[in-house]
Amino acid sequence: MIKVKNLNAGYGKLQILFDVNAKIEKGKITTVVGPNGSGKSTFLKTLFGLTKIYSGEIIFKDKDIAKVPPHQKARMKIAYLPQTNNVFANLTVEENLKIAGYVLDKDKVKERIEIALSVFPELKDILKRKAGTLSGGQRQFLAMGMALVRDAEVLMLDEPTAQLSPKLAEVIFEKIIEMRDNFGLTILLVEQNAKRALEISDNGYMFVSGRVAFEGTAEELLNHEKFKEYSLGITAV
Amino acid sequence: MSIDLISMILLWFGLYYIVSLSLNMEFGYAGIPNFGKALSVLVGAIAVGGILDRLLMLYFGIGGDFITGTTYATSAINNLIASNPIVGIGILILAIILASILGFVVGAIFILPSAKLKEDYLGITLLAISEAVLLICTYNLNIIGGYYGISTPDILAFVSGEYRGWVFAWIVLFIAFLVYLFFERLLNTPFGRVLRAMRENENTVKAFGRDIMKLRIKTMAIGSAIGAIAGVLYSLYTVNIIANAFTRVDWTFFPFLMVLLGGKGNNKGVALGVLCYVIVKVLLDIYKYNIKYALGIPFEPVWLSYMLFGVLMLLILYYKPSGLIPEKPIITPPMKKKIMEISGK
């Protein structure tokens, strides 16, 4: 669904990504793993248009969207959820969900909110609370619920389980699977919890120093020597 | 004395409420730190002194020097107004229309240089632009008479002097009420919610498909158009304009204090903030020398109002940053209907 070709990107004059080639398949979960500072989050930000692209192409539905600004990418049904700052803290949960629907037809918004609440029933009891008062898990539910309200086709998640307990992280992973299976979402996932993320994924990429060090199916990546070294914190010389 | 005091409080409440409501939309709702708010008020003065006065010169066939010419023109129109009150009301409406249009355009242009700026950088850029325009208007005699100033029509030339303050205060209050209704109607909508969202998190607003710059332009254009109305009213009240009357202290910083005091993102809260501050400030200005002698204050009491400003700002930001009346969720008409249904059951 999204093809990345020879992508070079960074922040201002600081280049982070070097000659990245990748393919995110429609209706699949693709996980990006790698050590801190490897460019995983920058990769997501670049796809969404929040970094400076020096060269390369991002092909989505047969069009190069590398130079398309974020708000137009959003209207192309691409949703990006940063690790933090992904909700409006001073607005209520209900208001957050409504705002997510502002690019849709009025009739459709109500329907989409009901769908979001069916996937995240935990939100029903807290609709009147300010988003800033939610726990970490509730906040992630809200952020992902907002993506569902928008009727997104591609969902890019940047470490959605960061700072959550293992039990809650597992719930998040289950929701991600549910969104892929029930709504056919294409999901691109950046996770520090690499092993578990790959276990729920279809495909995987390993980034090292801003380059793709390995790509393949999630299973292949799980069994790769490089990944084992990375998981154990061993650096081969 | 007390009667005049009340009319003065009402007048300043009305003027500052108009400015503060528009600042509340820009800063309280949209999160735009418009430290150049004084510019929109100055634009109202320019509409009256720079455009309306020229139209009057044209109408009465008066040529020659701008400053002198407008003196003759305003004398002529005042004579006309004295015998035809309708003309005065017409001048007021014309001035408001001119100012709103000019304010709208200037507001839209004013925000453009800051396309990539945020927060402090955005605020300081707007302040700098505002100051630059004020300096130009102060030293260029052909805009609003520079440091000499310029005459403006007395739209209440048909009212005797002793009642003029009262009548003008009620006109200002009426217009302030209309502005309040306008903002309540404009901001209790999905648009208002998007502005609040933009204040919270611009990247997430982009992520939901909205163009931040368009929202800023729209917000600043509307905010400046309304701010310019206050400039018109002030210029017509004083029946003259001098550029130095439109300083950042009076028309940017005081409104910020009033918005924060009353409660940003909340139009009723702003009313309370404006009322509290205006009462204290007017009383302080009038009785500052009585206070000096009563308390044995060892310095010039003219500084008391600035000290009050500083102390209040620190107290608000430290102890109650949400203001006297904190903001509430935006209730759009459909939500209101739903609430009525639920409570009706």
Curated annotation (Swiss-Prot), chain A:
PROSITE patterns: ABC_TRANSPORTER_2 (PS50893). The keyword Transport applies. Residues 2-234 form the ABC transporter domain. CDD domains: ABC_TM1139_LivF_branched. Keywords: Amino-acid transport, ATP-binding, Nucleotide-binding, Transport. Disulfide bonds: none annotated. GO terms for molecular function: ATP binding; ATP hydrolysis activity. Transmembrane segments: none annotated. ATP binds at residues 34-41. PANTHER family: BRANCHED-CHAIN AMINO ACID TRANSPORT ATP-BINDING PROTEIN LIVF-RELATED, HIGH-AFFINITY BRANCHED-CHAIN AMINO ACID TRANSPORT ATP-BINDING PROTEIN LIVF. Belongs to the ABC transporter superfamily. Probable component of a branched-chain amino-acid transport system. This is Probable branched-chain amino acid transport ATP-binding protein LivF. The lineage of its organism: Archaea, Methanobacteriati, Methanobacteriota, Methanomada group, Methanococci.
Curated annotation (Swiss-Prot), chain B:
GO terms for molecular function: branched-chain amino acid transmembrane transporter activity. This is Probable branched-chain amino acid transport permease protein LivM. One of its GO terms (biological process) is amino acid transport. The gene is livM. It is found in: Cell membrane. Its main location: membrane. Pfam families: BPD_transp_2. The keyword Ion transport does not apply. It comes from Methanocaldococcus jannaschii (strain ATCC 43067 / DSM 2661 / JAL-1 / JCM 10045 / NBRC 100440) (Methanococcus jannaschii). Part of the binding-protein-dependent transport system for branched-chain amino acids. Probably responsible for the translocation of the substrates across the membrane. One of its GO terms (cellular component) is plasma membrane. It is a multi-pass membrane protein. Belongs to the binding-protein-dependent transport system permease family. LivHM subfamily. The keyword Magnesium does not apply.
